Amino acid sequence: MYIVFMTIIDSHTHTWQYWPYEPPVPDHESRGKVEQLLWEMDRNGVDKAVLVCARIEHNPHNNDYVAERIKAYPDRLVQFADVDCSWSDEYHTPGAAARLSAAAEKYQLKG
């Protein structure tokens, strides 16, 4: 008999300081927060999550927010940066590679 241990990774999640959509969901004060994500991960047996930053609506500094939050949970969370999202003024402007390089230097990025 073999016992297999698997690490379960959610490869695409989002988290925000402020709920970005209108109308807000009833629990918009907690929905989308890192702590809520971790609770959902624990509840569903997920070991690690990739946080795909999205500088959407009320969260223009989402890269910074996520970077600060993952410092508290480095074993559980991984950050992917947002350098060219459709909600930003930089969308489809030249310099995405330079913005990614700058983000990689500033944050502990994995992607």
Regions found by a protein language model. Give the residues of each.
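Active-site gating/metal-coordination segments in enzymes
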Residues: K48, E57-G111
